[in-house]
Amino acid sequence: MTTTLITGANKGLGHETARRLIAAGHTVYVGARDIERGRAAAAGLGARFVQLDVTDDASVAAAAATIEAEGGLDVLVNNAGIEVRSPEGEIIGAADLTADVMREVFETNVFGVVRVTHAFLPLLERSAAPVVVNVSSSLASLAQAGKGYPGAAYPASKTTVNMLTVQFAKAFPRMRINSVEPGYTATDLNQHAGVQTVEQGAEIIVRMAQVGPDGPTGGYFDASGPLSW
């Protein structure tokens, strides 16, 4: 039995990924900050729930202790992410970017990935086939920079996630650690402006969560295959 933790899994891409992996036979932990929403999502999916705020050391440590006590972990999906907008709801470009905005975005999108991954590495190292999937974005690609999206902090955070993916993959060659680009998916993150459904967006996350020990590692993929960044 494969045991999987998905951060930010009470809605959107995380929720759909949980649904699909449960259907594939995984035991899934829905990680969510909000206890009520997380428990409701887990109950609806037939998943387990663990309270998990990726910005809080104590919350992450408690989640790791819970999952360790209940049997361990094979797959980690770092899905939780945010985009910070202006009080008027506008995307914040470089001209209006402040250190506070950058810090807020990085706290979840970058430091959250590091915090969670670091906490769960001891559990993953005990797995026979450990996998980490970091949910990135096409906006992480330097080749795509400047094409349509004017924001500064969110793309920078996802580019950082891609580099972290490479470095973690080098450090832990037995693990399959990859970044994925789900596509512009209609979720709360973009006020449901995305052109894809969550079913379409979750496709590459689900695929890479099931990659075998002989599969790729240290890569960046969308549903069509490897991407340059």
Where are these regions (language model features)?
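Canonical Rossmann dinucleotide-binding motif of NAD(H)/NADP(H)-dependent dehydrogenases/reductases
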Residues: 1-29
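Catalytic loop of short-chain dehydrogenase/reductase
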Residues: 82-86, 90-106, 114, 118, ...
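C-terminal helical subdomain
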Residues: 159, 179-182, 191-229
